[in-house]
Amino acid sequence: MNGIQYESFGVYLVLLDEEYVFLPSSRLPFSLGKKGENPQKCALRMKRELTGDGEGRLVSLPYVGRMDKDLFPSFITSLWAPGIKTIPVYAFKMEGERKERDWIRLDEARKMVEKAEKDVLFFI
């Protein structure tokens, strides 16, 4: 299963295979589509935003899907019309050298998300 997987508290994990995930650092491997933007326009915008990164060439992956608007914070949903129910999400990858710190095992990533949830609940 490739593509983007939403986890709570704003943690996005790109599932690479059954075992490893990519944790986004400063290089965003995904983008929320903007109004009137198709996957090609989104890819061009991402390439412009990441120009000068020096870490490889941005490669567009297939359109990932639409996610429920309620999963996103208000500063994102406010950019869209009030009546919309879902927001398009596109995934990308960088060709070139990968940074090992960006790759962790899927089970470790799940533990990180669970810990974040417990910490947040503890402080509420």
Spell out what each predicted region is.
Residues S31-K34, V64-K69, D107-A109:
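Short, solvent-exposed coil/turn elements at secondary-structure transition points
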